[in-house]
């Protein structure tokens, strides 16, 4: 499959602000945008795909029908005549959004240095999807009975699945913000904030390959029933309804393709510090995030594309700390660390093919590193202005992340890993030359992992890299 997207956007924002250096600082505004987005996303089934995914799936169902009661049910099979099948896909998904917002900050409230910020944003979002997807398939159908001996071929049947229509959704959000900050010196403060976050919903256009396959199966069965004698058609339809519960039901495009907005309440407490006459700058923070209707990206069951789903709710909490030290004119060092504990509070994953309930509640949210860290140092040599070389800087850094879970099941993960990087930078009046190396220890780790069609695929890290950057200023 291949997607081709074209997009146009028009936006406008009008803002009114108070003058600076006032005890009451405020900002009020209105904003809006309209985005046109057209996606052409056809899916092409080549010969193996036709055999395995279209012909194979429905023949497996026919085989199961026969094996459940081989003495009373006939053997049924079909043979797709097309070597290739193309499923078209054309989707227009425009989005309109407008917002009205206000934020006020009251400085030196009650005591000098204490400020309170309160804000509110009212947002309206309207989205729609015009969709068109069709296909065409030619096939033969075979029915074989043991008693009485009977072998009937239905040849040159045709099915033409078609999905065409429009979906519309709109959402209203009220997003408040409240923050307290205390400046106990011009360069040092501590703060507490509470905000409500929002992430837009949308449409899973790649799900249409699933929908069109379901409609294709229905149309193929309808073609068989139209060709079969009336007495035999009733028998075939009864067996199919018994083993294919969704047969005859209207496809629910809205339920299958729409994913809802994600909401979160975010709580943070922290401090910004400048110590030892500015030689040491420190940022400290602790946070808690309560997320509902969490959006999780996953592959569709057939493996033909990815979709976004609302998994349920999750909670995340952690700490972050960063330190930047200017030891002297030549040497500076930095260290940062973050810890995040992010788990699902509720995750209804639906049911398996054997109708078993899937529940990932309590599991770690995938793609969220438990630990992140960075440490680095730079030492610079400065030369006389008359020298052709102005400075030479030597830098080293170490970056790490992990443990990272790749699946909602938490059965595949990447343990903590770190990479060592270095850089030598030569600066002249007009020329800068950087010689750099990344992953100097040639560390092997996984940067991305996903599962589709019952197989796992991983993207490995880049090996040791060396390079030179040259910049000329004129």
What does each model-identified segment do?
Residues 16-19, 102-108, 172, 180-184, ...:
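Residue-level signature of outer-membrane beta-barrel architecture
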Residues 23-26, 111-116, 187-190, 277-282, ...:
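Repeated loop/turn-to-beta-strand initiation elements of outer-membrane beta-barrel proteins
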Residues 28-34, 118-124, 192-196, 271, ...:
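Transmembrane beta-barrel strands of outer-membrane/channel proteins
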Residues 110, 279-292, 307-407, 471-473:
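Gram-negative outer-membrane beta-barrel transporters
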Residues 3-6:
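Short, small-residue-biased leader/transition segments that mark boundaries at the very start
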Residues 37, 43, 50, 198, ...:
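C-terminal beta-signal and adjacent terminal beta-strands/loops
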Residues 27-186, 203, 215, 222-226, ...:
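Signature of Gram-negative outer-membrane beta-barrel scaffolds
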Residues 189-191, 212-309, 315-317, 338:
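Membrane-embedded beta-barrel scaffold of Gram-negative outer-membrane proteins
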